[in-house]
Amino acid sequence: MSQPVATLPEELLMEILARVPYRSLCRFRCVSPSWRTLCSNRGLLRRSPQTLAGFFCGTSQNICHLLFLNFPAGRSGQQPLVDPSLPYLHGGGYTHCCGGLLLCKCFTSSPPGVDYVVCNPATEDWTVLPHTEELRPENIILLGFDPADPSCFVAFVIVLDDDNAGEITGVEIYLSETRIWTSKQTGWAQETRVHHYQALNSLFMNGTLHLITKDSSIVTVDTGGKTWRKISRAYPGWECIGQSRRCLHVVDIDHYNDDGFLLSVWVLEDASGNWTLKHTVNLSELI
């Protein structure tokens, strides 16, 4: 007697197929009517990995106002999955982004005030952050999200002392898993300061927030507020930080000679604090 063929629960099957690029999935939509129906499921389409069709950006005049720029290879003439106006937020402005999620502030009329909202522009899912005393524009409010763990996000409030030239006095951390704010006194040295514009270039990697300070060092804090660290700079002035292969990278642009500027890429490959120069290139060669 032959054994019955094992089948997967529909919920599990949808979860698996949602991780397959949609174009690859649709190559098999002629297998059967049920498969064609599955490929036409709008919810599955929204969750499937998409070919990059564009990106959000601010302007030099108003960085809080978002624009959506299409790539030439985008789906020309078709309605985009993402509405760049984010109409469900009912006004407000962009504050920060991380891993495909946006942190926006929305103005409320009753009572008058501001709500901070974390939203996924691809799915139009959004969450209002609970109010806390330090959740205000005078402080630095940042988002942490790892697409490899899409079930949760983190919000950070970098608390500044307005009477002491913006010195950092503490950090408040919100975990979407617990829906609770946790307040921590700063574990960094006194006189640690971060500009608001520098904070926009923050990095969330391996469960840790990275910030460039006014003295061009990098300070870090984990989502539990337990591990605080300062990483010395490898070069006098860093332009931006980022990650590749789960390693911290920094980019510096320095005046090279009469021919132009030199772009340098440094990488921190372990916790030793030693930087390695990976790449250098004259910017004129990239144009």
Q: Across the structure, where does each feature detected by a protein language model lie?
A:
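N-terminal entry/capping and adjacent linker segments that precede and initiate structured domains
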Residues: 1-287
